[in-house]
Amino acid sequence: GDVSIKEVVEMMLDNFENKVYSRFKNAAPHDFNETIIMASMLEEEVRTPKDMKLVSGILHKRLETGVALQVDATLVYIKCSLLNRPDCRSIANTDKEIKSLYNTYLYPGLPPGPISNPGLTAIEAVFDPEKSHYLYYLSARDDGRTIFSRTLEEHNLNRAVYR
């Protein structure tokens, strides 16, 4: 009858290997880690597969140009998981100054590790980013949908409207 914890873990690892690892078998080890880190941010940052692909494209552009990723979900991770703050879901401007390698506002590049356990959709979005003219995005406060912008001016207007 009962399935042991070891059997459950083996099934999960087999499933992971079948769905994900096969795509990495010829990749360098750092590529695997970087993909999982990026996917973990997408998993926490946006909701829909289409938005994940668009945000993946934006984050790839930021990585290529050395611009800070500025992923709010990393601040939530720092506050909730690393600092155990009770107000961890809301973000204040002062949070962008928290000294942590996971702070993608202070430190360019990817954080040192994943911030969540990404799903297959987020991992696929890292492999298949959607190219666009967008450079900025935010989540609307009321319904969580992602609002994209081409310029900082447009982004700041969207922040005033949607946040």
Where do the protein language model's features map onto the residues?
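Bacterial extracytoplasmic/cell-wall-associated proteins, especially those involved in peptidoglycan
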Residues: 1-163
